[in-house]
Amino acid sequence: MNVVVDTNIIFSAILSSKGKIGNLLLNSVNRFEFFTTSYLLEELDTHHDKLKKISGINDSDIKYLKRILFNHIEFIDPNLIHPDNWQNAYNLVKDIDENDTPFVALSLEIQAYLWTGDKKLNRALKQKGVNWILTTNEL
């Protein structure tokens, strides 16, 4: 099963690398193929200080955890996503959170499930009839 991973999933995996999310990312090779876009890297960089403060983990350990997690995720160049999928994604999330557009667009592009811990996004997309969004428990 193809699964697009959004930023809050990686954020959670770094905060608790031995938790359920970290376990799914690191030990599900035969069940799931994980994908994301480079926007995830930008968001993690933007929130690095917050991640460091919340986790109490130093910079080198955060970098190490990212490297381990990223070895299990295929990064797709957002320039390869068709403009129609960008537009459709934007239309789906513009009233929720425009920052989720790249992840929704990639899900549309590769016809994959979107794995998110964002309850607001999950609820709003499901209300719009989206059936390809998953929570950690559903995964």
Regions flagged by a language model, labelled:
Residues 6, 100, 118:
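Acidic active-site catalytic centers that drive phospho-/nucleotidyl reactions
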Residues 74-113:
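Active-site neighborhoods of divalent-metal-dependent phosphate/nucleic-acid chemistry enzymes
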Residues 9-10, 40, 103, 120-121:
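Alpha-helix capping/helix-boundary segments
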Residues 20-23, 52-53, 131-133:
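Glycine-rich, phosphate-binding/catalytic loops in enzymes
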Residues 27-31, 35-87:
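PIN-domain endoribonuclease scaffold, especially VapC-family toxins
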Residues 17, 47, 127-128:
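Residue-level signal for well-ordered alpha-helical positions
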Residues 1-36:
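Short, well-structured N-terminal submotif of metal-dependent ribonuclease cores
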